[in-house]
Amino acid sequence: MQTLEIALLSTLLLFPLVDLVLEKYKFRSKCAEYIKTSAMLWVVTGFLFFCYLIDVLKIDPPQYLPSASWKVYLAIFIFAVFIAYMKYVLSSINKDANVRLQVLNAFEDGGKSFLEILPSSRREFLLFTLLVSVSAGVCEELIFRWYLYSSIEQHTGEFVAVIGSSIIFGIWHTYLGWKHVIKTAVVGVLLCGIYLYFESIVVAIVAHIFMDVYSGSVAFIARKAQGAELTNA
């Protein structure tokens, strides 16, 4: 293993500690935090690609699209169903006060750090959707499902690679609390399964983006509708 790859792995393993330290020095503006978080992800991903382009990393390039055309159509169908489901959920939150209250209580149970990263205003929602969700989807899938999974799989095997890369993925979210570390690790296993089944990093990236957009949309709509309800009361 070359020095640059050791530096890359060290960066990935120490990233959660850096994140915890930076939690104490947050910007007052949530939008500024979104930009900072996204920039950090792209810096790490840029370092990863630099190492790959100069042949430091002995891994194959990611497969972009499924080799079987029916898997492409299956992915499109699943995403279409997910979009329809998301529209239904958002409509229910907007119309039903009981559903809205359940959603808001669930977010409250997620902890302060989790609440703070979710958008409240329209500007925050747009930035969360177009910048944070896309950055997390692209960067984290390349880091965990492509690089880390491939690196671990070379030395251990598929099962250990799925679990190992997903655990590290979960640890990257330590700043949200240990409950979210476990949940995120489980999501990591799911995303790894998607990557392996569809044989496509693009499908995994889109799935990741949709998950984040869903969380941000639910939070924004619930808060917006609740605010309107209180104003009209």
Q: Which positions does each model-derived feature cover?
A:
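Short helix-terminus and kink motifs of transmembrane alpha helices
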Residues: D19-E23, Y88-S92, W146, S150
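Alpha-helical transmembrane spans of integral membrane proteins, capturing the lipid-embedded, hydrophobic core
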Residues: L8-P16, L41-G46, Y73-A84, T129, ...
